[in-house]
Amino acid sequence: MERHLITSAIPYINGIKHLGNLVGSQLPADLYARYLRARGHEVLFLCATDEHGTPAELAAAKAGKPVDEYCAEMHAIQSEIAKGFRLSFDHFGRSSSAQNHRLTQHFAGKLDEANLIDEVIEKQVYSHADGRFLPDRYIEGTCPNCAYDKARGDQCENCTKQLDPTDLIEPRSAISGSTDLEVRETKHLYLKQSVLKDQLDAWIDSKTDWPVLTTSIAKKWLHDGDGLRDRGITRDLDWGIPVKKGTQDWPGMEGKVFYVWFDAPIEYIACASEWAEANNLEQSDWERWWRTDKGADDVRYTQFMGKDNVPFHTLSFPATLLGSGEPWKMVDHLKSFNYLNYDGGQFSTSQGRGIFMDQALELLPADYWRWWLLSHAPENSDSEFTWENFQSSVNKDLADVLGNFVSRITKFCAAKFGSEVPAGGAYGSAELELLTKLDESLTRYQDYMGAMEVRKSAQELRAIWASGNEYLQTVAPWSVFKTDPETAAMQTRLGLNLALLFGVLSSPFVPDASEKILKCLGHPSARWPDTCTDFVTSMKPGDPFEVPEVLFAKLTDEDRATYSAKFSGTQS
């Protein structure tokens, strides 16, 4: 039995996430966690809400609530939605937890002891109307390069030119619109990442099995232009983790908090501590997952995230862990994803364009979405959601192949042999050929799943389902029954066992349908097969079963047209 630590990039607190967010981190992480558990491995699967930073403060203000109250409410909402999608986190934590406060302050103290922290006087824009320093992206104005009048203080979205806030013509606060701004001096802490450049470079080079997407982004940040730059890790905000050196105050840093991208990855560790506390476990129970001097040396740690999060996870967070000088578990494999687009464009919250996680669950069961998203995961390039493709995939894969097979074989057996597995008959060449083919498919499926090749795993699973339908079409037990009921009984018994096999193998992708199949076939606790050949004797003659309800209802053209119009972004 192996030990696997799995983390998904933690979703930001300010609102409900769209399907692109889901398929870029949490959903493939859940697929992998479910697969490893099914294979008998020990798994700790962690995620949390990312609750600090200016966007959280602004979202709370817009909602008319104190920021801590807003974050608590949104955490509860995101937690329920995650359950709706059957995301099997062992714990869904919060970056505002007491555990993350302690650990973040601890790491800052260790980095300072290692002489990896600089105190830097810098100039930032202060808004009198808002009573606060403004992060670069909360300053808008006219771009000096292209005259676009909504350029941000960090970059012009129109011409993509990198900017400083002082470059903008007629700058204004993006919060209040006020032009009553001034440049003030303020002191902040910087993590001296540049000192760790060679160490990080060698560490990344050692990860020969990482996706090209991951390593190319990391290398670009390491070597392009001026190379890896030191990074500010504090902000002038009210909401966040107060700046301390461990448990000690940090002179000159009063009233400041740690930057959200410094504390957010540390929440992966803090989340394990939260998990231990929530389950009345000891400190040693979470440390055995994270400290290589306390049992984590045999842990394989895998992270899942969208490509925009790769720089922080391949450089900044590893710099924190390495720089601390402590024996923390470093990531072994980082699975990154490209973007999912929506029907010819991007998802847009403000424009009501695209499907968000709560809306998806109101429309259709989680399995429909899980299957489409995973089978179209944006692994090697961006992918696109269209309602035509979604309808086709649900109907042709789930309804016509998996659902149809289970319905067909159980109904036939119930009609001809009753509601028990029939006895009689012996395998012929068709059965032996099928089982050889299935054993080969199972090996490929397991190889793809173990390698986190999400699309290939889905394709192989569908091929396994299809082999069942092809077998029934070839041997036609409904015709054989008329002249040779013994052989028809064997074919039907094998068909029922294939349905059970498909239910088990499908559990990481479509857990609700899998559970229904296993329950109706009388084997709710069926285990992952060693081989298909051995597994298909699980249901014995005389075992009772039930014909399940329709597993997957087809989507009509009318359904597709309704959904497409609803989420096009044209609604008021």
From Swiss-Prot:
One Pfam family recorded for the sequence: tRNA-synt_1g
GO molecular function (one): ATP binding
SUPFAM superfamilies noted in UniProt: Anticodon-binding domain of a subclass of class I aminoacyl-tRNA synthetases, Methionyl-tRNA synthetase (MetRS), Zn-domain, Nucleotidylyl transferase
EC numbers, comma separated: 6.1.1.10
Binding site for ATP: 349
Source species, domain of life: Bacteria
GO biological process: one example: methionyl-tRNA aminoacylation
Cofactor annotation remark: Binds 1 zinc ion per subunit.
Keyword Coiled coil among record annotations: no
Keywords (A to Z) from UniProt: Aminoacyl-tRNA synthetase, ATP-binding, Cytoplasm, Ligase, Metal-binding, Nucleotide-binding, Protein biosynthesis, Zinc
Positions that bind Zn(2+): 143, 146, 156, 159
Reactions the enzyme catalyzes: tRNA(Met) + L-methionine + ATP = L-methionyl-tRNA(Met) + AMP + diphosphate
Co-factor(s): Zn(2+)
EC top class, as a word: ligase
Span(s) of short sequence motif 'HIGH' region: 11-21
UniProt motif ('KMSKS' region) ranges: 346-350
GO cellular component entries: aminoacyl-tRNA synthetase multienzyme complex; cytosol
Subcellular location: Cytoplasm
Biological function: Is required not only for elongation of protein synthesis but also for the initiation of all mRNA translation through initiator tRNA(fMet) aminoacylation.
Subunit: Monomer.
Family (UniProt): Belongs to the class-I aminoacyl-tRNA synthetase family. MetG type 1 subfamily.
Protein name per UniProt: Methionine--tRNA ligase
Organism: Roseobacter denitrificans (strain ATCC 33942 / OCh 114)
